[in-house]
C-alpha cells in the first residue's frame, strides 16, 4: 500500500470536525483513490510530546462523533458518550481522544457519495477497500497531523477489526489496544448475513448500479431492509423475546395484515438509518467487513496473531451472535500481549459493546494502563515503558 508524503496539518478544535487531506491512496488490491480526505474529531489536548493520543474507532454505521450532542454535520449525538470526557474512561484531562470517519464512509471522509475531480460522485467507481486500507488511511491522516505513534487504539465490531489491523500491521505505532466484540477474520455466518444485506440494497431498482447520487432516486427501501436484517444480528435473542415476544404492534392485528411489535421495531431501525446513512457506503464498508482477515498475506491467522507483541485487552459479550465469544477467546489465546479476556454477561447481544457502559469503561481503563504512558496530559513528560502483561 502506497501513501505519498503530505504536509503536516492541524488538529481541529475540541469537538469540531476537521478534514485531513492525505493525497492519493493505493489500496491493498492496487486501486488508486485520488484526493482522499479523512474527517477527524478530537477531545482533550495533545501533549507537547504527542504521546497521549487514544484513537477511537467506530463500527459500521458510526462516525467520528464519539461524544457530544447532535448538530451541524452530526445528525445524531455521540455514539459512545460515556466513554470520552473529563473523568471518563478516556479521561480528556489526561488523554487526547481522536476519532476519524472511516475511509469509504459518508460523514466527511472520502467514499462513494464524495465528488471526484470531475465533479461527479464516485458512485460505482469507488473501489473495493479492506479493513487494512481503512487503517492505512487513518495512519496517513494522523501522520499528516504530526502524530506517528499513539498510546492506544480502542474499538468494537468493525472498529475492533480496525484496532486489530493497527496492532498487527503497525505494532511500533501503538502501545496498547482494546479489541472488543470482534474476531481475527470474517466467519461464514458473518459473510452470509452481510452478503444478504448487500443483495437487499442492490435489488432496489433505485440502486441504479450504484450511480444513484445525482438522480433524485435513492435505494432507501433496500437500505432499510438491510438494516432490519443487520439489527437482528446486533441484538440478543433473549433480549428481543423478552421485549417483544410474539406480541402484536399496538392497535394492529397480524392475523388481519397488521404487524408484530418486533416487526415495527425493526422497520423503525431501518427508517432511522436511511435518514442518516448512504447506501453506497453501507455496501463498501460491508464488503470490507466480509474481507476482514488479519492473516491474509501474513502466513495465516495464527502466525499473524502470534507475531504481534502489543499489549491488549480483549472483550466479548455472552449473547453476541454476530461475533460469538469463541472468536474473542481465539484472540486472547493467540495474542502474546493479551493481558486479559473480559467477558460481559449481557442479554443485549453484539450491541452490548455500545450499551454496557460500566463493563466497557473498565476495559478501556485497563487498556490505558497497559499503554504505560506516564504523561499527565498536555504538560506531561512523555511515555514510560510498556507494562508487563500476563496471559489469561
Swiss-Prot record:
It holds the Pfam family Abhydrolase_1. Pathway: Amino-acid biosynthesis; L-methionine biosynthesis via de novo pathway; O-acetyl-L-homoserine from L-homoserine: step 1/1. Residues 373-392 are annotated as: Disordered. It is found in: Cytoplasm. It catalyses: L-homoserine + acetyl-CoA = O-acetyl-L-homoserine + CoA. Keywords: Acyltransferase, Amino-acid biosynthesis, Cytoplasm, Methionine biosynthesis, Transferase. It comes from the Bacteria. Residues 52-356 form the AB hydrolase-1 domain. The keyword Amino-acid biosynthesis applies. The keyword Acyltransferase applies. Substrate binds at residues 227, 351. One of its GO terms (cellular component) is cytoplasm. Disulfide bonds: none annotated. Its EC number is 2.3.1.31. The active site is at 157 (nucleophile), 320, 350. GO terms for molecular function: homoserine O-acetyltransferase activity. Its main location: cytoplasm. GO terms for biological process: homoserine metabolic process; methionine biosynthetic process. Belongs to the AB hydrolase superfamily. MetX family. Transfers an acetyl group from acetyl-CoA to L-homoserine, forming acetyl-L-homoserine. This is Homoserine O-acetyltransferase. It comes from Mycobacterium avium (strain 104).
